Regions:
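Active-site-proximal, glycine-rich beta->alpha crossover segments in alpha/beta enzymes
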Residues: 45-149
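N-terminal basic, low-complexity leaders that serve as flexible interaction/assembly modules and, when applicable
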Residues: 1-48
Length: 149
């Protein structure tokens, strides 16, 4: 799934199909809330029947220090997908982008995979609120860079 999000031609085609077929009022860029993490070089994959799985969950302040050293990465694939969509749809159909909330993405980073109770994330929030805040700020910066693309 992430591979198709990171392929500009494929993402643009998937984005434009509903507009062509159903004449909807707007197009939503085909993506996933994990794409900003993938662009930043974080080991993340979507496992069928499970959802997002992180190669290295962020559990400690030193883990937060390590991951927050990464920058937003190369967003040219997202920029190209958006350019292709706009070229096809013109200025009459708005293109909408989206990103995951910093809390949601941070919880995935700490848990390492989907969780119903978020025990590890809640533990970090209470035991090390500064590390949690740094992680959320980093994710917010990733989201901002992604949405700007």
């Amino acid at each position: 799934m992430l591979d198709s999000c990171l392929n500009p031609e494929l993402a643009a085609e998937i984005t434009c199909q509903p507009v062509r077929r159903h004449h909807v009022d707007g197009a939503v860029l085909y993506s996933d809330i994990m794409v900003p993490l993938a662009l930043a070089g974080t080991g993340v994959r979507i496992e069928p029947g499970v959802g997002p799985v992180l190669d290295e969950p962020v559990r400690t302040a030193s883990d937060v220090d390590r991951i927050t050293q990464r920058n937003a990465g190369d967003s040219s694939v997202i920029e190209e997908a958006a350019r292709l969509v706009v070229a096809e749809l013109g200025d009459t159909t708005p293109l909408i982008g989206f990103a995951g909330a910093p809390f949601t993405i941070s919880a995935y980073l700490v848990e390492g995979s989907p969780s119903r109770d978020h025990l590890s994330a809640r533990a970090m929030m209470h035991s090390d609120p500064q590390a949690w805040a740094r992680l959320m700020e980093w994710v917010a910066d990733l989201d901002a860079a992604f949405l700007a693309a």
